[in-house]
From Swiss-Prot:
Family of the protein in this entry: Belongs to the peptidase S24 family.
Site-annotated residues for Cleavage: A84, G85
GO molecular function (one): serine-type endopeptidase activity
Enzyme class: hydrolase
Name of the protein in its database record: LexA repressor
Organism: Citrobacter koseri (strain ATCC BAA-895 / CDC 4225-83 / SGSC4696)
Length: 202
């Protein structure tokens, strides 16, 4: 998404707020009146600019034909601390949604996970970083995965052999986690596909 000018942001915020309050987008005349434009045509020019930048879609032939493409409730969910025994993407674990394009990652990211600890620092995954995760159980040895052991969620490099799984850290100060699949509950929650440093820009 290209950055919006201050005026374009005003128009976008007005559309979003109007939809939130009334259930429908404003007309060009209402935008012009609210923001002090001389005519609805001026509002139309700003709408076209917003459409070019990919944040709205203009539906032709309708006075209220504006559709938001950048909805704050959409985007990648950010998962924080996970309570024992509950699904990773349970609503209570989601701290918010962030406008990160899933296709920036290969394969596409499905959610972000806030990293806790420094066990993977040697490959650049730091405490507090946001890890982009592709939700899948189809993973191979050597890949960095998000795994759940009993009720604990961890990020490690996978090494599986028979009934034994080793979850390898990327920090010599940490020891591998060894899982006996005959005795412990073990689930792959997803594959790490990228990292966003500390989330400071979010």
């Amino acid at each position: 998404m290209k950055a919006l000018t201050a005026r374009q942001q005003e128009v976008f915020d007005l559309i979003r707020d109007h939809i939130s309050q009334t259930g429908m987008p404003p007309t060009r005349a209402e935008i012009a009146q609210r923001l002090g434009f001389r005519s609805p045509n001026a509002a139309e020019e700003h709408l076209k600019a917003l459409a070019r930048k990919g944040v709205i879609e203009i539906v032709s032939g309708a006075s209220r034909g504006i559709r938001l493409l950048l909805d704050e409730e959409e985007g990648l969910p950010l998962v924080g601390r996970v309570a024992a025994g509950e699904p990773l993407l349970a609503q209570q674990h989601i701290e918010g949604h962030y406008q990160v394009d899933p296709s920036l990652f290969k394969p596409n990211a499905d959610f972000l996970l806030r990293v806790s600890g420094m066990s993977m620092k040697d490959i650049g995954i730091m405490d507090g970083d946001l890890l982009a995760v592709h939700k899948t159980q189809d993973v191979r040895n050597g890949q960095v995965v998000v795994a759940r052991i009993d009720d604990e969620v961890t990020v490690k490099r996978l090494k599986k052999q028979g009934n034994k799984v080793e979850l390898l850290p990327e920090n010599s100060e940490f020891k591998p986690i060894v899982v006996d699949l005959r005795e412990q509950s073990f689930t792959i929650e997803g594959l790490a596909v990228g990292v966003i440093r500390n989330g400071e820009w979010l």
